[in-house]
Amino acid sequence: MNFADSFRDKVALVAGGTGALGQEISLAFLDAGASVVATYRRKEEFDQLVSAAASAGFGTPAGALVDATDAGAVAAAVQKLIDERGRLDVLVNAVGGYAGGKNVWEEDLATFPRMMALNLESGFILARAVLPVMIRQNRGWIVNIASRAAYGHSAGAALYSASKAGALALFDSLALEVKSYAINVNSVVPSIFDTPANRRAMPSVDPARWPKPAEIARVVVFLCSEQARVIHGAAIPVYGRT
């Protein structure tokens, strides 16, 4: 489906919008004509996004250096966005982090709050900041980037799985809370997808079976389109052939 210019005059906040998947989501919304604000933690990653957008002939994304686990910083960034642009149509939560390789009884105690902050608390903070705006508008789309690990069966990554399961439940509950408004809330659920880091971590696995970040990004854009208004409270698997 071609979304060229279908998001013109819409504003998309892509939290974590410069990572391997987040960058492709930011680019996909730019390609569809949206005004994109991408949050980031590393300036060099935002610079890469700007360069990729320019090379593709897209508009220039705006950036916000924000720690998504800092409620005050997120609230300030959202307020700045509203002050400058007057509206917020889309939130994509692509913030997250991974820790694995240890059994539960071997894990450092510090790993638990870190996984919960990156993968669960950040989504709560973001949703809490943008929902009052979307409710006032009576219009909006929220997409949470979840993980197949949320469904369990992830030996060696129990804390990551638990944090992602919590986030999936959070956004599922949020969908029920806003069902009387014209606000759509969904999750996209990837498994392993094709990134340089995953190729390095699994050199013996054929990456041809993995979905590309750009393919997942197109699903995210579709879920934020008028054509997908009927999809609400869903968790869409994007596993490819993994």
Residue map of PLM features:
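Alpha-helical segment proximal to the catalytic Tyr-Lys
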Residues: 132, 176-177, 229
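Residue(s) in the substrate-gating loop at a strand-loop-helix junction
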Residues: 147
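Conserved glycine-rich cofactor-binding loop
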Residues: 11, 18-19
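Substrate-binding pocket helix/loop in short-chain dehydrogenase/reductase
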Residues: 102-104, 108-113
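C-terminal helical subdomain
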Residues: 180-181, 187-188, 195, 203-242
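Conserved glycine-rich Rossmann-like NAD(P)H-binding loop of the short-chain dehydrogenase/reductase
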Residues: 34-49
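Active-site helix of classical SDR
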Residues: 127, 163
